[in-house]
Amino acid sequence: MRLSFGEPVGALGILLVFGITASVISSVATGRLPVRTGPLVAVGTMLTAVALAVEASAPSLWVMAIGTVLFGLGFGAIDAALNGHAARHFGARDINWMHASYGLGATIGPLLVAALLSGGLSWHRAYGLMALVQAALAIVFIVGRRGWRESPRANASRAGEDKPRPGDGRARRRPPAAVALTSLTFAAVETGIESGAGTWGYVFLTVGRGLPAGTAGVAVSAYWAMMFAGRVVLGPVAERLGPARVPAAAVTGIPAGAALMTAPGPGLLAVIGLMILGLAAAPVFPLLTLMTPQWAGGSTGVTRMVSLQVAASAIGSAALPAGLGLAIGAVNARILAPSLLVLGLAMGSLYVFGSRWSRPTTPPVTPRA
């Protein structure tokens, strides 16, 4: 891509900045829109299809940047709308499986594009094929947009967000600023840990702990596999035990895994720590989304709160890995593990604070066939 544009590798970083900024703006705005999930998902998917078509025909980096902004706007709307819908309707199992599907797509997508490129297709055509797939999905969502109807209880919850009834103290209640900020910071730190461990795990294991390149590559792939498996397996566990118990164990497991990565010893110990970290982190963000009514003190403001959490997670997943990269460049690769340990402990403290101030609420509606 950079060769066809005649640009250095560093110039492609501009695309990342544009895409994340657009996604954050879109996520925040989505929480304030009165439209329902179906139209939002349909419009967002169509916008990503248009964005991929623009990118497929891009003659320069700046046209590619326009496509990236459009894609970020569409993706942010989809992400916030789906998570908001899940917070109002799903149980612990379903929301974890939804996020597991994100991970599966993120794993399969690059492999498919790599296969297309290896088969002789240019990246322009690969993007064009992805645009067609997204357009087909958009048509499916447009046709089925009425299938996202809110249940009567969820409609009452949604209406309460925008029009609290006079005399109803619970409907007027808003989360204290400190609790809201805690929730957003927690989301940013947690997703930053996930991305940071996955982004820099290979460098840490090879340069920092001296493992062979092949072993480190398998370990990092296994880390992402643990994220996927953890959401598939721990979702039903959280459904049975309650969504509050699993995150409490997970926020303990994340610093425990980072501590094993930090501890002196054979490289295998660091690999085990990375696996534990991945497994522990897997269900945290999905269950945070599910527990938003508790952190928000009731149904009021759930959709807006979730949209802000999605925006915070996008910022954290970009900013913290970048900061960890600067730390690795300034010190050495081994600094990753203690940095993750400190972040994990900070995340645990945020969770304890937020949980102390959260209020129990009725569980979300789980649709039945």
Task: Set out the residue ranges of the language-model regions.
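Conserved MFS/SLC helix-loop-helix module at the cytosolic interface between two early adjacent transmembrane helices
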Residues: 24-62
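Cytoplasmic helix-loop-helix junction between adjacent transmembrane helices
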Residues: 67-102
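Intracellular juxtamembrane helix-capping segments at the cytosolic ends
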Residues: 76-90, 282-298
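Helix-loop-helix hairpin linking two adjacent transmembrane segments in secondary transporters
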Residues: 98-149
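Extracytoplasmic gate region of multi-pass secondary transporters
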Residues: 176-229
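A late C-terminal transmembrane helix in Major Facilitator Superfamily
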Residues: 298-333, 340
